[in-house]
Amino acid sequence: MSSRPKSPSDDEHDMRSAIAVMTADYCYLTMSHKRSPRHQATPSRTCLFCGATGPLNGEHIYGDWLRNLGFTGEGVREIVPGDGSQPIIQRGGPFSKKLKIVCYPCNNQWMSGMETAAQPMLTAMFNARGSSVELDQAAQLTLARWAFKTAAVAAQVDRSDPFPLPHRREFRQTDQPPHHVQIRIGAASIPMLQRGEQLAESRFEPRTATITYAGQSISFPFYRASFRLLTVVFDILGYVAETDLVDIDPGEDLKRALLPLWPPEHPRIWWPPVTSLDVIGGVPGLTASPIVGVPMLVPGGQG
């Protein structure tokens, strides 16, 4: 992982505020998602990823190593349930929130390793200050694994358990993001809201996708998980099926604002992309953007 010289197109991505501004003692995190009736709550004392039963450990939604970057003051967390109920407001350190949802081996060995591996890359992006950070395929996989883990944990914040169980199990078994998942990375500014600087935000939306061809249709569970940590944005699209159904296309506009991490498409990529997600309204605008897919399986026939 290295940096290349700043180019004129990098001017719009000046990241100096990433360190200079975000060291305020008062910060604001938002987590929101829609609940899906398809997913029942995981039984208590069952590990989110491996399914082991027994005592569970608390897992930070965002790693506590972030406090070493200066984010240690008073904070506010807002949890917005997708069922229309009132937002839940919590006070506490910006990156101190834990969820007791994983077993000891998953938390202290497997997930801890992911956090440790991703930390230098994330820190380099936080400190980019207008330069571009090079990510080879090994770095892309490291960030994709970390992003999928983080999105799955964040989705459990109100205990509605919306994240598809098959994808959690596949992730644990293969140690890679699931086959029917696409992960992209982008950049956005840190909003200043009424409660303070919004250091992080995450959204999870379960949906139903439908492929229609020659008058026939196939519907299947689909989801989008998007989150921003400081100035780095991850967008995760996935569907649950036993065969390849669709190739998700972000569209030409988003291709300039999102770089592919998983599955890898390029030996090297440079973050940030040429276009900031600020132009579409950050994470809220991203989750509202349409999703286009090319069918890979013809209903009633062969793919």
Regions found by a protein language model. Name each.
Residues 6-10, 164-303:
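C-terminal, charged low-complexity interaction regions
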Residues 44, 48, 134, 220-221:
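Intrinsically disordered, low-complexity boundary segments flanking structured domains
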